[in-house]
């Protein structure tokens, strides 16, 4: 029988949680982060950096709490983009077979299972470069079905036009994911079918529609340390910065151009998590792809550095992820709670109670 978090969570006084609150954005940080300033943080002695990150984290978030989100590929493969890390590109021979958009019943069944296992946010990914309006209409039906289960919803569908973002907002979408992937200076080494500015434009359309932003990047694609600093600076300088910041460690999939990239030094990955926490104190910093290759000790350091969200479930789109039992056991060993918790700053509660 599969364990759930309720099996291992210590009893605590009930805290009323309101799932759906009016959309608001966190206040932008005073000033901007230069790449040099971010690099100086990354270069701090490791223990000093973790101490600073944990101090910032405790100023803004309850200690020991982690958001559980589940990610489902609702339309797999056949993408015309050439992102060098992605096994869903039609340009690469990775063994991924293109599949049509899942039905409402299929998605509802998956979302209900995720909710029953402890997830509070359900993310739906579709391998499109840019969805057509008829696709947006169908995804709207999926959003409504998932929200009917009492879960927060997130979608990642590719580039959006302003009217499409408005339609998703009208369907009840809470979050939209659109990653920057890396620093602008390194971006063309990773993908050539979409401009960096197009990513920024989609983020603007999402923000203007009143949808919360989920935006992060990938570490381990052959980038230099300065490019990691550049990515964090780009994210932190978005006005306002994203409510959710997923940090991925490259999963090297055979058949993709980046399959032979050198592995990321685990402590370097922890450093990126720590600097994301310091520069974006009220964001959910999410451990995303690559957790399966980290091990418990590295994940524990990431939580210490300020990560407070994970993708929960045995698959992320088409790549592996630790199974639910493994995550339940890890959180229990660390004395952490996988539950819905808000930022300790009252004006930010509506964004950070996923």
From Swiss-Prot:
Keyword Transmembrane helix: no
Catalytic activity reported: (4R,5S)-dethiobiotin + (sulfur carrier)-SH + 2 reduced [2Fe-2S]-[ferredoxin] + 2 S-adenosyl-L-methionine = (sulfur carrier)-H + biotin + 2 5'-deoxyadenosine + 2 L-methionine + 2 oxidized [2Fe-2S]-[ferredoxin]
GO terms of biological process kind: biotin biosynthetic process
Residues reported to bind [4Fe-4S] cluster: 79, 83, 86
Residues engaged in binding [2Fe-2S] cluster: 123, 154, 214, 286
Classification via Pfam families: BATS (PF06968), Radical_SAM (PF04055)
Enzymatic class: transferase
Family, per entry: Belongs to the radical SAM superfamily. Biotin synthase family.
Oligomer status and interactors: Homodimer.
Protein name: Biotin synthase
Gene: bioB
């Amino acid at each position: 029988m599969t364990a759930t978090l309720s099996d291992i969570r210590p009893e605590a006084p009930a805290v009323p949680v309101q799932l759906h609150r009016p959309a608001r954005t966190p206040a932008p940080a005073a000033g901007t982060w230069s790449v040099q300033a971010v690099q100086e943080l990354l270069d701090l002695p490791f223990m000093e950096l973790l101490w600073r990150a944990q101090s910032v984290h405790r100023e803004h978030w309850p200690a020991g709490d982690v958001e559980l989100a589940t990610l489902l590929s609702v339309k797999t493969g056949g993408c015309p983009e050439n992102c060098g890390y992605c096994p869903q590109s039609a340009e690469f021979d990775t063994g991924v077979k293109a599949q049509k958009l899942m039905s409402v019943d299929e998605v509802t069944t998956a979302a209900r299972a995720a909710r029953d296992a402890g997830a509070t946010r359900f993310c739906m990914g579709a391998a499109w470069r840019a969805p057509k309006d008829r696709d947006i209409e169908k995804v709207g039906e999926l959003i409504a079905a998932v929200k009917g289960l009492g879960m927060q919803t997130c979608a990642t569908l590719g580039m959006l036009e302003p009217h499409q973002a408005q339609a998703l907002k009208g369907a009840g979408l809470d979050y939209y994911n659109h990653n920057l992937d890396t620093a602008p200076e390194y971006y063309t080494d990773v993908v050539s079918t979409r401009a960096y500015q197009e990513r920024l434009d989609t983020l603007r359309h999402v923000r203007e529609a009143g949808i919360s932003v989920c935006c992060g990047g990938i570490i381990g694609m052959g980038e230099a340390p300065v490019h990691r600093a550049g990515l964090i600076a780009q994210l932190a300088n978005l006005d306002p910065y994203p409510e959710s910041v997923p940090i991925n460690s490259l999963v090297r999939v055979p058949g993709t151009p980046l399959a032979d990239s050198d592995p990321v030094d685990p402590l370097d990955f922890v450093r990126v998590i720590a600097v994301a926490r310091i520069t974006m104190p009220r964001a959910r910093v999410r451990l995303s792809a690559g957790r399966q290759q980290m091990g418990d000790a590295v994940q524990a350091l990431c939580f210490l550095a300020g990560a407070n969200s994970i993708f929960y479930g045995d698959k992320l789109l088409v790549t592996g992820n630790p199974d639910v039992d493994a995550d339940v056991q890890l959180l229990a060993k660390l004395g952490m709670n996988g539950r819905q918790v808000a930022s300790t700053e009252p004006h930010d509660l509506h964004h950070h109670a996923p």
